[in-house]
Every structure is written in structure tokens, then in C-alpha cells.
UniProtKB/Swiss-Prot annotation:
GO molecular function annotations of the record: cytokine receptor activity
One of the record's GO cellular component terms: external side of plasma membrane
Protein family (similarity comment): Belongs to the type I cytokine receptor family. Type 4 subfamily.
Entry keyword annotation includes Acyltransferase: no
Full protein name: Interleukin-7 receptor subunit alpha
CDD domains xrefs: FN3 (cd00063)
Stored PANTHER family: CYTOKINE RECEPTOR, INTERLEUKIN-7 RECEPTOR SUBUNIT ALPHA
Protein keywords: Cell membrane, Disulfide bond, Glycoprotein, Membrane, Phosphoprotein, Receptor, Signal, Transmembrane, Transmembrane helix, Ubl conjugation
Amino acid sequence: MTILGTTFGMVFSLLQVVSGESGYAQNGDLEDAELDDYSFSCYSQLEVNGSQHSLTCAFEDPDVNTTNLEFEICGALVEVKCLSFRKLQEIYFIETKKFLLIGKSNICVKVGGKSLTCKKIDLTTIVKPEAPFDLSVIYREGANDFVVTFNTSHLQKKYVKVLMHDVAYRQEKDENKWMHVNLSSTKLTLLQRNLQPEAMYEIKVRSIPDHYFKGFWSEWSPSYYFRTPEINNSPGEMDPILLTISLLSFFSVALLVILACVLWKKRIKPIVWPSLPDHKKTLEHLCKKPRKNLNVSFNPESFLDCQIHRVDDIQARDEVEGFLQDTFPQQLEESKKQRLGGDVQSPSCPSEDVVITPESFERDSSLRCLAGNVSACDAPILSSSRSLDCRESGKNGPHVYQDLLLSLGTTNSTLPPPFSLQSGILTLNPVAQGQPILTSLGSNQEEAYVTMSSFYQNQ
């Protein structure tokens, strides 16, 4: 009996193990299955076999135990409520004409008739086109380009006819450096200048739905390989880079020439060739030998005989000369009229209007000295008081005039007398006009005079 009981126990245990592996799990095993991640993804392909559409789903986690798991679609179907998927290794698919393609369908993962997870999906938004085929590359020697052509089965379909294609090409040695070109047609032109010469290239293409239908990229088409030829420039052709540099250089030189012609006289010539003074004067200054023993002295004592005053303006000199030339004749005429009219003054007394003050005479003499008039500097400077007025004119007035004339005549007989004594009246000599000399009557007849001879001796 003991042996028989042990045998039945072993058989029962084996049946439990076999039933668990075959899918007849108990309640505890079902709870463990519910804890797994059964997320999945699906895509649809329209008109894959005539008018039939296909729907393919797969779990996102490849390690999921798919034993006893099944897919079911419900809603947006024609004539039926739900359809079950068929399993092919790790994927689940269904191929039928009963997809309505309007609205959303409910796709669920079930185990033992119980739904584990569900998704609502619109089949028109998960369309995956078929991969392009017949990819080829043709080189056109005359145009120096490559024409890429391919074909797709969607050109003859009713639903998904508008596609966007992605053409990818790379140099064979650059494994991860793909260059992509997107286009809606099935023809592409690659320029030879954009490719490396004598290089092997790999090219492939894929498609994605556009406009109404949305979805995923198709699988890549089989790769196509082509080689670029060597660049042989014909004798008449020129490198584009060299041509560009030549044109830029030509325009730059032309611009510089135009600017030089326009700005030559105003800007460039004064800097490059500055204007020089008259060549005759320049050569005279350069070639003329300096004179020797020049009578040039910077000794301050040489300038003691001639007082130097500052002249701030040329107008001051003109005013003084005009004053001396215009004022004195008028005053002399008035003096004559007064004398002839029998005024109170003595006949031998000169009018006060004729008398020149020492300050004005000094100023005029200094101006003439500055102008280089030696005769003006040599003129005697007379200073006296007017204490001897007209009351003493009858006694020593004529005598003073005669002494003055005698002293001037004895010191420098060559100079014309600046005054003429007519009837005891002192007047200006017309010859000496422009060189007025101050005369005044003074009580002291022993005044010092500076004559031309003493001036030359000092020099």
C-alpha cells in the first residue's frame, strides 16, 4: 500500500507540472501573468494582396512569454464584431477585406478569455508602406551627374498613393556619414561635383505615407552601389573656384583704377607728389652762397637810438600818416587866417593848433623808425616848455627860430630845413612834408639835439 500511494503521488505531481507548462495554469499563475508588461505596437498595410488589408502587432518587450496569449480586434469592421489574430513566431497578424478604415478599432491582448491590455487605434494613422524596389543609378557623362531611379508598388494602389521618399547615400568607407534627400517623385539627380571622384558609394531608399494617411517609414530598399569617375577637365573648361577668384580680382583692380582716376588731383597727388614752390626761388635759396661780413648785430645797444614800439595793426600806421598829411595843412591855413585877421595873438607867435605835442611826434617817429625811414629817425627831437608864450614873442621869439635854423644848418647842411621863417611865423617846409618835426618854444636855449651825424656815429 505504501508503494502504491507513493506512485500515485508522483504521477499527480507530474500532471500538475505538465498542465502548468501547457497553459492550464491555476489561479495563482494567472495572477502572475497579469503583473507582466504586455505593451504592444501595430501597423497596417493597405492593399497588400489585391483588395485585402493586413494588420500586424508585436510586443515591445521581446522577453515576454507569449504562451497562451492572443490578440483580438473589435469595432470598425464590416459584417463582423471581432476578429482574432494569427500567431507567426513572435508576431500576430490578420489579413482581411473587412476593415472599414473609418473610425477606431479596439485591439486587446487576452489570455484564457480574459483581457490583459487594450488599445484604441485608427488603422489609417498606422500605415506602413511597402519597401521601394528596382533601385538603380545611371551616370550621364555629358551632364556630369547621376540619375537615381526606383519603383514602388503604391503607384498602382487606390488608397496610399502619395508617399514621401527618403534617399540616403554615403561613401562606402564612411559607415555612419549618411546624406539624405527627401522627394515625392521616384527620380533623383546627383551632381558629380558634389561627390568625391573615384569613390564607391552606397545608396538606398524608403517611403512614408503623406497627406491623408499617416504612419511609419517603410523598410529600406536593397542597397545599390556605384562608382564615381575620375575628373578630367577639358582644355576649354576652367575650375569654378579659379574662375571666381579671377573675376573678383579683375573687378577689384578696375575699382582701384577708377578711384585713382577720380581722386588723383584732390587726394592722391598732394600726398604722393606734394606741391613745391617756384623752382627758380628754390634753386636760388639752395645754390646762393651766403654773404660774408654781414652788418648784422643783435647787441641791444644798437637799438637804443631808435625807440621800438609795438604796432598791433597796420591801420594804426595808416591813421597816423593820414593825420600828419591832412591835419597839419588845415591847421596852418587856420593859423594864417588868424594872423591876417589881426587876432589878439602876437604876429611872431605860432598858433597853438600848429604846435605838435611831444607824444604825437614821438609816436610818429617810432613808427617811421620801424618802417625803415632813416630820415625820420634822424630828425631832431625838441622838448621845451611853453613857459615862453606870446608875451615874450617880441623879445626872443624870432631869435629862437633863427637859432634853431642855424643849429640845423650847421649840423647838417645837406638836409632841407623843415621850417621856413616868414615874418616871424613858423611854417612847415613843403619839401619836408611827411617828416613832421616837433618845435616848441622854450626858455632854455641850451637844449640837446640829436643830429644825423651823431646818429651815424653811434651806428
